[in-house]
Amino acid sequence: MRRVITTLIAAAASAALATSVSCTSTSNQPSQGGRPARTADGKPNFNGVWQALNEANWDLQAHEARAGMVTQKGVYDYEYARVPAAPVVALGAAAGVPASLGVVQGDGQIPYKPEAALTKQQNGENWIDRDPELKCYLPGTPRAMYMPYPFAIVQGTDKIHMTFAFSNAGRVIHLNKVEGPPDDTYMGHSVGHWENDTLVVEVTNFNGKNWFDRAGNFHSDALKLVERYSPISPDAIRYDVTIEDPKTFTKPWTISMPLYRRLEANATVLDYPCIEFSEEFMYGHLRKQQLVKHWEGETMNVDITRKIPPGDRLHEWYRR
């Protein structure tokens, strides 16, 4: 039975990190009592492994469940009867999109300029070719904060370090005065300060090559973020982000969600080498014997019955 969403607005470090970060100390254990633990300097203790538990990485806005990130017209000419596009058929239900009430505050809409709204639509229709996540690019801010993977925080008095499972990404929040980077970046340049118990971070210097989610929501190099990290329980943070980009949006807008501390005794951010995993996707058209039916430029048309032929070097690797 088709389920329809009727509600469109959501209710509302001093040391550098290694590629794999383990936070198994008391900082990753449940806080005692109803108040957040504090560091030696009296600030809320954000040390530990954290993760968002929502569907924002699929689409920031409220949406119904659907058969795939990319769909095409089916036998019946109804929007709800669309079927997965050929490249995602073989993934079955794993390629589906879970429903969500959304995380965009206010009216739940993203205020795109008309030309930017068209680009967003085209992004969604060409997700397989365009989404930076599929190519294991650095996920960018704020997307790294709500991807379905854990991330670790190591908190110091002058710096706060974050490391993310996806793409081995990292970012540093500077709490002391620091010059901006010479070049724009995927993750941006973060400068923070404390307002009572809330960590406020301004993020600038983006290269404009990231998306916010798999639905094609995007930004330009004019993006400016103001993040607010506010403890709401011993092991939860309310994460609010005000997004401003005059090249793309008509006005600032805000997303909001909780982030949760991972409470396993051995909670760890492990290496997720997606760069290696995406090599066939990005460079398969250069193979002498391609694994897909054919390529049109860098766009693959997948033959889901294609098997790696015996004798192929990759075939022998899988037999090990």
For every predicted segment, state its role.
Residues R2-R320:
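PEST-like low-complexity, intrinsically disordered acidic/proline/serine-rich tracts
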